Amino acid sequence: MALKLLTLIALTCAAANAAKSSYKLCVPAAYMKDCEQMLEVPTKSKVALECVPARDRVECLSFVQQRQADFVPVDPEDMYVASKIPNQDFVVFQEYRTDEEPDAPFRYEAVIVVHKDLPINNLDQLKGLRSCHTGVNRNVGYKIPLTMLMKRAVFPKMNDHSISPKENELKALSTFFAKSCIVGKWSPDPKTNSAWKSQYSHLCSMCEHPERCDYPDNYSGYEGALRCLAHNNGEVAFTKVIFTRKFFGLPVGTTPASPSNENPEEFRYLCVDGSKAPITGKACSWAARPWQGLIGHNDVLAKLAPLREKVKQLADSGAADKPEWFTKVLGLSEKIHHVADNIPIKPIDYLNKANYTEVIERGHGAPELVVRLCVTSNVALSKCRAMSVFAFSRDIRPILDCVQENSEDACLKSVQDNGSDLASVDDMRVAAAAKKYNLHPVFHEVYGELKTPNYAVAVVKKGTAYNKIDDLRGKKSCHSSYSTFSGLHAPLFYLINKRAIQSDHCVKNLGEFFSGGSCLPGVDKPENNPSGDDVSKLKKQCGSDSSAWKCLEEDRGDVAFVSSADLSHFDANQYELLCLNRDAGGRDVLSSFATCNVAMAPSRTWVAAKDFLSDVSIAHTPLSLAQMLATRPDLFNIYGEFLKNNNVIFNNAAKGLATTEKLDFEKFKTIHDVISSCGLA
């Protein structure tokens, strides 16, 4: 009796513990409200979930590894990133599939489709054919074919370091195939994209619109590649099984056959061994993309069943209405929301089942091209390494490597001496770096919704009569701090360039020009005024709040010299810009800063040496990474706080990257030279 009682108590306690099971779901901080709304959804399961905020999915993986969270939804590429984290014990324990193919082992399988009578019996004979692809950088139409073809001796080598890895790919494909259709953005830089499409134009010649070679195109995408094959004189198409079956009206999973004008008997799958298989039968796939799913640390296996059931019930609850949390928190979608249990498996083994690791790790032939980014702190080194693995997982090449030096100047010297390829500088340091280390700018940060550089601007109150610089002589001025481009360097350069003041003793002369008094914060600091000149006029208009916008608001000044990034402090109904960059002067609204300003401000800029890698190679990885993450900062927020530090590698305020135009750089050099004559640069 006592034994039965103890057994009953033990079972009751076990049930209670199971009922009280709780799990920590990691979610990008931007989606915390959505996660909390999800927690309010009633389910049969009484398992408790807790939302743990992280910077992004990359940080979520670290949180799971460190037991700060238990699990996180991931893509196959994230599984690869997870496999590279030291001392990790991740397991993939649930898959996200489609209702159409709930039992399919993979999300999709890559196939080659050819005309049945095409005289071909091995993959080498693909050389010289007319090829149809889904689009550049896509899995079944681009990445997987390249992974397969580069193993063949007849495929051109892709290790020419005089051009970028991406151009190596395009050059090889254009040499191997007679004509093709490969639409999309070949480069994140518009000029490079245009140049490549001109040079390798026959990679576009099979498209509906060869001159554009971009989406939308009738011969792009999964079905478009098959249309290209069937109706546009194509000889081989690279696509996936499910769309091949749909194209020919064949049943797919739970979806029955449907009428089609296409005849499957006229086409065949081309297998890796060179044999052909009927379209109506089992496809011979040679690589696949795994399903998305949930990844957790090994400890979740001890109490896996209740967690799996909870996730399934939440997925079922959200399937009809697709609330925000459905996608943003659980990672489900309109098509992919069937949650299936799988045998828990290590991420790398999960990818290997589909031969997908090989696709991710596809190289270009030894020696692999590497771009070395120089950084100056341990935190920046950690971020650089995280960026490197993430970019590699997303097929962004060249490989990013990280070099650490103890100062900005040491990094610039490292680039000059070919110890690294890239280093960043802020503001007018870009011109100084060019002069001292013989470097040149490659790309820079852009800001705001419009993704533009910042500009030095002159703000005045509406109703005033100022239209050009001469109208301000003898007036009062407000400035951003002494060390800033917008507050000091730009207005000084403008006044000197317009011969409104002399370049000798230029700061003192600035005070003479605005003889009504100024507020230039920091002008009286010993390091800024080593000779101890009388700069009282330049401090005369400063109050308890020395910000330029407060100075103008309180009528302590007639004009404020600030950055366009500061315009949010000004009421557009009360203030306007003075267009000093226009010969006729004039005024414009605050939002017109790109065309009404004092000068473009140099952003944080990355510089390179002239004698080593091409600028296109150097810029491709950072620009591609920025382009990919522009709409998906939840994957990796490269502009956000990193390990509780701000402005690591990129400024927090940045919204993207852009190549630096030579003309803009020449202007910065001119400004630098003029300001140097004042002894300021």
UniProtKB/Swiss-Prot annotation:
InterPro entries named in the record: Transferrin, Transferrin-like_dom, Transferrin_Fe_BS
Signal peptide per UniProt: 1-18
Q: List the disulfide bonds.
A: 26-60, 35-51, 132-228, 181-207, 204-213, 271-284, 374-411, 384-402, 478-551, 506-678, 579-596
Transferrin-like domain sequence ranges: 23-364, 371-676
Record-level Gene Ontology MF annotations: metal ion binding
List UniProt keywords, sorted A-Z: Disulfide bond, Glycoprotein, Ion transport, Iron, Iron transport, Metal-binding, Repeat, Secreted, Signal, Transport
Specify the glycosylation sites in chain numbering. Answer: 218, 355, 418
Residues that hold Fe(3+) according to the record: 75, 108, 222
Give the record's GO biological process terms. iron ion transport
Keyword Nucleotide-binding included in the entry's annotation: no
Q: Which family does it belong to?
A: Belongs to the transferrin family.
What protein is this chain from? Transferrin
What organism is this sequence from? Manduca sexta (Tobacco hawkmoth)
